[in-house]
Amino acid sequence: MCVAALSGAFTFYNIMPWNEGREEESARDMVEYVERTGNPICLYSLPMHAEGRPAMTRAMRMIESYRKVRRLVEGTPVKLGVLLQSTLGHWSRVDREIEPWQRTVRIDGTEARFCPLDPGFQNYIREAVRLLAAEKPVMIMGDDDIRGYSGGKLECFCPLHVKAFNKANGTHFTSEQLREAVENGKEGDPILEAFVRLHRKTVCDFARLIRAAIDSVDPAIPAAACMPGMAWEQKWSPLTAKALAAKGQEPILRMGNSQYGEILHNFSELTSRSLRTMAFFSLHGDGMCLLDESDSFPQNQWSKSGTTLHSKLVSSIFLGARGSKIWYVNAHKSGGIPVSRVYTDVLARFRGFYPALAEAVKGTDPAGVISPAHPRFPLGAGAMCDTHTLADGIFGTMGIPYRCDVHLERDGAYVLSGEMAVEGFSDAELDLMLSHRILVDADAAVALTKRGFSGKTGVSAAFDPSLKFKEDYFDAGGFPMYFTAVRKPAARFDCAAGVEEFSHLVFVDPETGKRDPVTPSGVKFANSLGGTVVTVAYSTEQYWAYLHSEQRRDYFHYVLGLLGPDALGYALMNPQPAQCLARRGKERDLVAVFNFCPDPMRSVLLKCPVRPKSVRRLGDDGVWKPCAFREIGAGVFEIDDEIPCCGAPVYRIDSGMAY
């Protein structure tokens, strides 16, 4: 069973709020939503975490509300399902009356949610899910509280878990002792690894309990999971999705890639969300239907934008998403307050666009410089990929395509940016990357020097507080750029024999104007591993104004060119902040442009690796429409298409003669 069979090539799961006493209003909202958008699936959101005593009293109120809505939408196009919005619960329990079940104990010793090992709590969840399954929902989706932490703190160290841990490992820990051992454990520590196994088993067993309750009624009902926000659970959240899936059903997992705030000043954060989405696809994309976590939750009137909701959807579908979990579109919140219908308008306008884009992505592969992802990081810390680095922070706003990959053996041009990125990789992984073609920034160069890799980069790098100069790359046919060190000093390079220097930090004599080189700021080195390493004295930990300029963009075009003709590929040449994503195929290429500037792009200036035969833009209705274009420079083409602020057009480029 494939998720596409539920709705189409791209499936929306619209979460509708529990609306006790206003079920007729909810049913009308759902019918209107389906008729306008063509998206039939609505999941009624039920916060099933146990509250009150007996907890089933509140649960039965929600189940009865679901039954009323189900009866009201019978005979309509609505396909009704359930979001188990909270089972374990997102937060600590604060009820006045509470069931006498075991509470989870977090790593700081505080109590939080009900423990999934408690038999009474298990019986409650089993019965509630069984009753919901009897209503024949089209889908049951578990929310992201099915996880092993709450409030950002690791669980569980309660008496039930400590007993299970000691029995499995032949130990005699108390809760306090186990918490201390886990908190101080390092990678490879047998106690830490044993706890991680129990931690994972607890979450997966809870998902299996839900699946078993569904199966006791109807094994054919599909179910899905939502990825939690903590990176160390994101690594193995596909296991939860597999545990929830029906037999023969493709596992469905909503990614944790939302920014939850659609207003303009957050829009450029789309680059870091794009990078994270790329990492999820690289790590979990095979055999898993990944859904976008879309930014439609209506927090308040200052955070709503259907335009940027659409742009986020475009980026995720372009990267491979096959569905989306959206919140409260066309609904009413508590008190009868209508959710902004701008979300409905956008989904109605683009109802043909989203499935057409999902179909077009098939048969193409992500293109651009590779930012490596690392699934190895400490329990409770780190992330699969570092953000606000050269890839998403600089290239993502300079129109230079990038991608993220966890498979470091893959050939291509890499970029290693930031000290934390280096710390996340083993020596063997760093060797593998340095055997490719790779761009290294100042922070990564200093970190590699500390790790003993200077012999493989050709550079011994250290930050030098005395360096605050202009930067020259006249030798590369360029021009001077201002180089400032407000937040972090520049890096000084001591270069090995055989290193090619192509730019320098220079001191400008105040009397003569003579430019004297102080240290190389851009070097190229062919190492013993067979790799080509280009290192630049450029840190991303500076002010935005000093990080971005047309000169700096041209500099990086030149630098990437040193890594081979395929390192750059497509690139946006407009003099304003924008993200450019690219995919390459045998017969066609796809390019998506995201305008981050409040000013429109009057036309699209696109550097192309080959001369286009034709350029088409995907219309709102899902039909590819031809665009006029002309060559304005070597390999640069002007496409007659205006992009408004936050616009996100997708172009299909059919290629002809290569340059």
Where are these regions (language model features)?
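Short, acidic/polar
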Residues: N19-E35, P119-L132, W236-A243, S305-S316
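Hydrophobic targeting/anchoring helices
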Residues: T37, S45-L46, Y149, V217-L390, ...
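Aromatic-lined carbohydrate-recognition surfaces of secreted/lumenal glycan-active proteins
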Residues: L6-E20, K79-T87, M141-D145, L192-S237, ...
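The substrate-binding groove and active-site-proximal loops of carbohydrate-active enzymes
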Residues: A9-R22, M48-I63, I107-R126, G188-C204, ...
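Aromatic-lined substrate-binding rim segments of carbohydrate-active enzymes
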Residues: M30-V31, P47-E99, I210
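Active-site-adjacent "subsite" loops/lids of carbohydrate-active enzymes
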Residues: E64, K79-E135, D144, G148, ...
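Catalytic domains of carbohydrate-active enzymes, especially glycoside hydrolases
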Residues: E24-E51, L131-M139, P251-I252, S311-G323, ...
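A conserved amphipathic helix/loop scaffold
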Residues: T387, D392-G393, V406-H407, V415-Y659
